Amino acid sequence: MKITPKIGIDKLIFGMLQKDVEALYGKPSKSFKDEDENTIYQYNALKLRLTFYKDESFKLGYIVGSSPELLLLDKKVIGRPVSEVQKELTSKDFAKWEKEEFDTLENYFNEENWMILQTEFDDVTKVEVGAIINAKDEFEWKFKK
């Protein structure tokens, strides 16, 4: 499954509605509302969690993935040392990373591409990607019907 920064993962494109996602992947393994009333879809087989934002007419705005099949720049990400992944990304508009620590986990956030590499024991365990917010403070939806 290819990660395309600013656009989505695999066939998932930011701005899709729930029905668009279900047409591609079927019903989710689990569906629930978060504390902000956003709809969350969880696809266990794909190891993906999708967030549809309530305030944006339930458009797909955020994806969390932990599948070992996730590819970024045609290379696997999950299970690899974060320093190795970051080194490969530095020349591809991923120069600046902010590090945040939570007990045994670290998050490395790249704002320009709205991506988080979550690590434990220095290896990437999850990748989070979100729709880009432009200078007008509006989402840049990539999905066009």
Q: Model-flagged regions — what are they?
A:
Residues 1-145:
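Short helix/turn-capping signatures at newly exposed starts of structured segments
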